[in-house]
């Protein structure tokens, strides 16, 4: 569908002809205008302050886990079933059942997930907000959510939209005869859209995300702006099933699905319902975010016929896949392989395939009792038949439908839970007992935890082991900072810092200190566990974090502060067999400004990548600032590089980073090595410090400099230590869903 309003354009330099960087006129802040209009390339620190507490109408004391636990899930299922099977005149149900629509709604909510940064997915209920609520691929899903309002209204705070959207899809499958694998509640609603990079394109269905032969830009997964997966008409509307198979494989891979899971999801999902392309697409009105006020948040209002029911237009494709569109069976594959196919067009002018030579005419039921139809398929459906790998998989299912049911159940379960993180976050009576490899399992605690006396003893042993403050802090940070708040993966729990692939990540300097630290901590663990009384044990994962805490206490003492860094035991150690190496590989940081590491192939300069990392760690701007300053003086840099170590007292927890960054006696200039680093020279012209773009941005950016001035003041040292320890403790426990 063409964009209703052309995007604002800029000149190549970002400045208008009169020297002003804004084209057109400035907008009021309430219209979205502001500093970013004047300086488009400035750091957007708002990405660190998303969904603030003041925006949450439920209040700080609200406990969603406690509320959702009170729901009678059987009664909820019946309520959703009633909605699904009660057609509404304002949006009539195809075949009298909204189940297929709800499956699409759930699929498209969860299907925005992508592996490279873990963003997207159903958590937070983001489908309610722009841009997702107005993506072309989500046309008419605004109606699906409105249909569910009576259910949401009834359960109120006990049931989030995020859970309801996905659970409705699960219920739809069950309602139409399919046995699902299970379901976990626990998705908490957010109250504003996430700031997520969905692509560089400024028009719907743009595809500037490709380079080379057909290399898709990271971290994106969908093929075009505004699509969830692939273009159902084929690549850029080219109805070539073999070419479409290439897009399908790459796109689904980037959403964590292998070939079997991909085929199962397509076959299973297209066993139900239909697409909608009853008439010309240019008769469809604007998406929800561009629709007139009086449409009350609904979009895509069509002037073709009644605009609904038999006249509905969504994708523009008019396909009914099976002769039993509200029943689980094997008819999709039977029809896919039972006919030869010819290229045709829908009434809306979209490419699709129809059974050749009129075969099967009249065998497909009309959704509203009209004459029977001919079998039809999408170009991407035929990909399952023409691609050799997909063909081998799906032909077997043609003869073994029970295998299809099993694979679809598991793939659907993965699809709708992939962004939820560990099973400790899954709530409710429908959670399966089985934990799957993609859920990054960690063993349950099977021993007594260490207490204060044991913790004190272990700290002493660690500090007496010969390991330095730098080594201990770096290792603990490397383990814990692998966490991603987007999909709740990574973190210190599991002790995977010593397993593949993490132990070999370049950012962890695998040929440097890491293996020595691992070996030493393992020796301490073995010695302690063999001598500890009763069933008291300590895990390697706990020792990694405890080592960092002990090192910080030592560094604080060196700076004149006697502190205790919080430590919460209870982490356990995963095995290599419990760790999917390929799946974990996408967690490898390509940049970590906290360690002054910048790998190759990053899309933005280092300071922007720092913000992205801080966002994934759910840090605020003050937390990010205090952590960078503290980690620099503790010597936690990648390969112990001197960049940003603005202190003469390394491994001492001082505020020297901030004090020296603000020193007006230092003049900064790019390094003659032309390697992206900078030299800070004193009045004599002597190089006193070296720094990276990440370091200097804290003095250059006005908002970050304001924070630096807090920690660089003469009275700031106690506050700096306090705030650093609090931020450190937060990062160390980001993955501890077992205790929060």
Curated annotation (Swiss-Prot):
Here the cross-link named Tryptophyl-tyrosyl-methioninium (Trp-Tyr) (with M-255) sits at 107-229
Q: Which cofactor does it need?
A: heme b
Q: How is the cofactor bound?
A: Binds 1 heme b (iron(II)-protoporphyrin IX) group per dimer.
Where does the record put the Tryptophyl-tyrosyl-methioninium (Tyr-Met) (with W-107) cross-link?
A: 229-255
Single annotated GO MF: heme binding
- Alphabetized UniProt keyword annotations: Heme, Hydrogen peroxide, Iron, Metal-binding, Oxidoreductase, Peroxidase
UniProt keyword annotation of Transferase present: no
Report residues binding heme b.
270
**EC number per UniProt:** 1.11.1.21
Q: Which GO terms describe its cellular component?
A: cytosol
Briefly state the protein's biological role: Bifunctional enzyme with both catalase and broad-spectrum peroxidase activity. May play a role in the intracellular survival of mycobacteria.
The family annotation for this protein states: Belongs to the peroxidase family. Peroxidase/catalase subfamily.
Protein name per its UniProtKB record: Catalase-peroxidase
Q: Which organism is it from?
A: Mycobacterium bovis (strain ATCC BAA-935 / AF2122/97)
């Amino acid at each position: 569908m063409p964009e209703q309003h052309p995007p604002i354009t800029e000149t190549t330099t970002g400045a208008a002809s009169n020297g002003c960087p804004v084209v057109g006129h400035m907008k009021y802040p309430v219209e979205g205008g502001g500093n970013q209009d004047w300086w488009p390339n400035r750091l957007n620190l708002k990405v660190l302050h998303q969904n603030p507490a003041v925006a949450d109408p439920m209040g700080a004391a609200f406990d969603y886990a406690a509320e959702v636990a009170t729901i009678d899930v059987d009664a909820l299922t019946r309520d959703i079933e009633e909605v699904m099977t009660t057609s509404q005149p304002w949006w009539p149900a195809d075949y009298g059942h909204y189940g297929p629509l709800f499956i699409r709604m759930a699929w498209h909510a969860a299907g925005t997930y992508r592996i490279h940064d873990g963003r997207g997915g159903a958590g937070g209920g983001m489908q309610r907000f722009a841009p997702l609520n107005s993506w072309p691929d989500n046309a008419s899903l605004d109606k699906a959510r409105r249909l569910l309002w009576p259910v949401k209204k009834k359960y109120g705070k006990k049931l989030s939209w995020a859970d309801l959207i996905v659970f409705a899809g699960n219920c739809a499958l069950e309602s139409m005869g399919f046995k699902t694998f299970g379901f976990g509640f626990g998705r908490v609603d957010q109250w504003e859209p996430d700031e997520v990079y969905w692509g560089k394109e400024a028009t719907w269905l743009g595809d500037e995300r490709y380079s080379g032969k057909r290399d898709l830009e990271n971290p994106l997964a969908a093929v075009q702006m505004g699509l969830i997966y692939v273009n159902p008409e084929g690549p850029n509307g080219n109805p070539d099933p073999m070419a479409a198979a290439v897009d399908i494989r790459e796109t689904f891979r980037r959403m964590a699905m292998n070939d079997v899971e991909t085929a199962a999801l397509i076959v299973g999902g297209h066993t139900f319902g239909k697409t909608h392309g009853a008439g010309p697409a240019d008769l469809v009105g604007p998406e929800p975010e561009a629709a007139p006020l009086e449409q009350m948040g609904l979009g895509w209002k069509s002037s073709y016929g009644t605009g609904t029911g038999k006249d509905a237009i969504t994708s523009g494709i008019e396909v009914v896949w099976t002769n039993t569109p509200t029943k689980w069976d094997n008819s999709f594959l039977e029809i896919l392989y039972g006919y030869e196919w010819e290229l045709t067009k829908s009434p809306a002018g979209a490419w699709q395939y129809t059974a050749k030579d009129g075969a099967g005419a009249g065998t497909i039921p009309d959704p509203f009792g009209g004459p029977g139809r001919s079998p039809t398929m999408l170009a991407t459906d035929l990909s399952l038949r023409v691609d050799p790998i997909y063909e081998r998989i799906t032909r077997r299912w043609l003869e073994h439908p029970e295998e299809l049911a099993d694979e679809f159940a598991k793939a659907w379960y993965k699809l709708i839970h992939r962004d939820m993180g560990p099973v400790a976050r899954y709530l409710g009576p429908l959670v399966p007992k089985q934990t799957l490899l993609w859920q990054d399992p960690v063993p349950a605690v099977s021993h007594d935890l260490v207490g204060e006396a044991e913790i004190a003893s272990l700290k002493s042993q660690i500090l007496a082991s010969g390991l330095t403050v730098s080594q201990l802090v770096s290792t603990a940070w490397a383990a814990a900072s692998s966490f991603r708040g987007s999909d709740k993966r990574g973190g210190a729990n599991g002790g995977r810092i010593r397993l593949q692939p993490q132990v070999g990540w370049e950012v962890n300097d695998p040929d440097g200190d890491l293996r020595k630290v691992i070996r030493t901590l393992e020796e301490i663990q073995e010695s302690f566990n063999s001598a500890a009384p009763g069933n008291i044990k300590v895990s390697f994962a706990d020792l990694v974090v405890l080592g960092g805490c002990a090192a910080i206490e030592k560094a604080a003492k060196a700076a004149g502060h006697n502190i205790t860094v919080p430590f919460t035991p209870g982490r356990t150690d995963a095995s290599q067999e419990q760790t999917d190496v390929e799946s974990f590989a996408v967690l490898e940081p390509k940049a970590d400004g906290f360690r002054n590491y910048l790998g190759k192939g990053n899309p933005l300069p280092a300071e922007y990548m720092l913000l992205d990392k801080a966002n994934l760690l759910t840090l605020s701007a003050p937390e990010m600032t205090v952590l960078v300053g503290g980690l620099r003086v503790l010597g936690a840099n990648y390969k112990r590089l001197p960049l940003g170590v603005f202190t003469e007292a390394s491994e001492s927890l001082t505020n020297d980073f901030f004090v020296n960054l603000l020193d007006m006696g230092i003049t900064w200039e790019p390094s003659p090595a032309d390697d992206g680093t900078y030299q800070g020279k004193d009045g004599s012209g002597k190089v006193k410090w070296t720094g990276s773009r990440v370091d200097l941005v804290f003095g250059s950016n006005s908002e970050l400099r304001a924070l630096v001035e807090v920690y660089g003041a003469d009275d700031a040292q106690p506050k700096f230590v306090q705030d650093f320890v609090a931020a450190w403790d937060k990062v160390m426990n980001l993955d501890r869903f077992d205790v929060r």
